[in-house]
Amino acid sequence: MIVLQNKKISICREITVAPEIVWDILTDTLLWSSWGPSLVDVQCRDRYIRLGSKGRVKTLLSFWLPFDIIEFRQMDFWNWRVGALEATGHKIIHDTDNSCTLCFDMPWWAVFYLPVCWLALNRIDTLAMIQVHSH
């Protein structure tokens, strides 16, 4: 589902896994390059991000950009700045104890990034299913 609201575009996907598992994947910097198609490496002092976490990400084009977490609400939403730009927001909507809707939002002018976010949503769904079935 794609929604345009408040000058932001959101792309969402329902994931039939407990919201806590999805949140763990979203906030664990060791997993970011597993689901983020535009990232190949992450360096951050905090394994699990929080408000004010800082680090750097290596892009597919092999250059590093600094990042900082500029908004963080536990089990709800986080947003970051990459380089000089506010980047994607990451939101979890709790549907049931065993499912949630995960949304990425971005400024309207970043519409070209929707396919990257769609791929990330699919990868997170796969990672979440693997975690459920491995426990």
Residue ranges and their predicted role:
Residues 49-56, 72-80:
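Short, hydrophobic/aromatic-rich segments at coil-to-beta transitions
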Residues 77-135:
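Beta-strand/loop substructures that line and gate deep hydrophobic ligand-binding cavities in soluble
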Residues 13, 65-71, 87-95:
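Hydrophobic/aromatic beta-strand elements that line small-molecule binding cavities or substrate pockets
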Residues 6, 60-62, 84-85:
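Glycine-centered tight beta-turn/hairpin loop motif at sheet-sheet or coil-to-beta transitions
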Residues 22-26, 32, 55, 69, ...:
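Hydrophobic pocket/interface hotspot
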Residues 1-45:
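Hydrophobic ligand-binding cavity/cleft-lining segments
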Residues 43, 58, 63-73:
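A short, surface-exposed loop/turn module that caps and links secondary-structure elements
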